[in-house]
Regions:
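Bacterial N-terminal signal peptides that target proteins for export
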Residues: 1-10
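Short, Φ-rich (hydrophobic/aromatic) sequence segments
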Residues: 13, 118-123
């Protein structure tokens, strides 16, 4: 009888430990370089976090760190994820130099049709041709933004000759090479540095999509928006990556890995591209409503 009681108590204790372990909440540290009011923070990353919490029945959740709150500069974000400082990150592929060289084909002029379709194509391409570039992380999504625009301080760009001598900010090597070929003097910098560079006259303008521009006060810091001909594909776009720390992913039980997998990949990449590009139209209205700003 005593043995049976001990066995029962031991079994109950094991069950309690199992239930406790199963019910443990795992909080993922998610980091990006933009502000807390941006669509990247509230929707693109925010929805992903809501979805994994829902699908895991609360066993997974997120703490989103905006504006590089975990330290460092935007070009360091990918390595922060690889090294475990952050569990998940969202960043521009080109901020890591030539680390994602195979993805840069999607930043070539006139490659992008619309951000949703191009993001689907980018994920499919990356799975087939860029696995070596992602070997140190678990890649959750790759995507592009909507058509890039040209914002300038003093004069619009309406013809090829107008590029000559203008110091224009570009996000990645592919885009700065394009600006150089057009006759401009390219200045590479992460997008958070654009407002100060414009206000101090370090640059004459910047190429960025509409959606991020009002949050950077580009409508106030520039006088002109030059829109590339919409009858063509986009003049340029930028590739974004969303990596997860590989060790963190591998430490999850199988059912939670399945939750991450369900909310990542082709469809999530398409969602990211569609959502970011969908913010272009309301952002353009901010420029249209800004006194003294002209769209050509």
């Amino acid at each position: 009888m005593k043995l049976n009681i001990k066995q029962s108590l031991f079994g109950a204790a094991l069950m309690a430990v199992g239930v406790s372990a199963q019910a443990e909440t795992i909080t993922l540290k998610v980091e990006h370089f933009l502000g807390p009011q941006t669509i990247q923070h509230t929707t693109m990353l925010g929805e992903w976090c809501k979805n994994i919490e829902r699908d895991s029945k609360g066993r997974l959740n997120c703490q989103i760190y905006h504006s590089m709150q975990l330290g460092g500069k935007p070009p360091q974000l990918f390595d922060q994820v690889k090294d475990g400082i952050a569990d998940v990150g969202w960043t521009v592929a080109g901020y890591s130099g030539t680390r994602f060289a195979r993805l840069q084909v999607f930043e070539l002029p006139f490659m992008m049709t619309n951000a949703e379709a191009t993001s689907r194509a980018l994920w499919t391409y990356a799975e087939k041709y860029a696995t070596e570039e992602f070997k140190d992380v678990k890649m959750l999504a790759v995507h592009v933004h909507g058509p890039g625009q040209i914002f300038t301080r003093e004069a619009p760009i309406t013809k090829l000759e107008d590029f000559k001598g203008k110091k224009l900010r570009g996000p990645t090597k592919q885009v700065t090479d394009l600006l150089k070929d057009l006759g401009a003097t390219p200045v590479g910098m992460p997008v958070p540095a654009v407002p100060e560079a414009l206000s101090k006259g370090v640059i004459d303008g910047a190429v960025i999509p509409y959606e991020v521009a009002p949050g950077l006060k580009v409508n106030e810091l520039t006088k002109f928006t030059s829109e590339p001909d919409p009858s063509f594909n986009a003049l340029y776009t930028t590739v974004f990556v969303m990596p997860m720390n590989k060790a963190k992913y591998e430490s999850l039980p199988a059912d939670l890995k399945a939750v991450i997998d369900k909310n990542s990949g082709l469809e999530y990449s398409a969602f990211m591209g569609k959502t970011q590009a969908g913010a272009d139209a309301p952002a353009k209205k901010v420029f249209q409503a800004t006194a003294g700003h002209t769209i050509t």
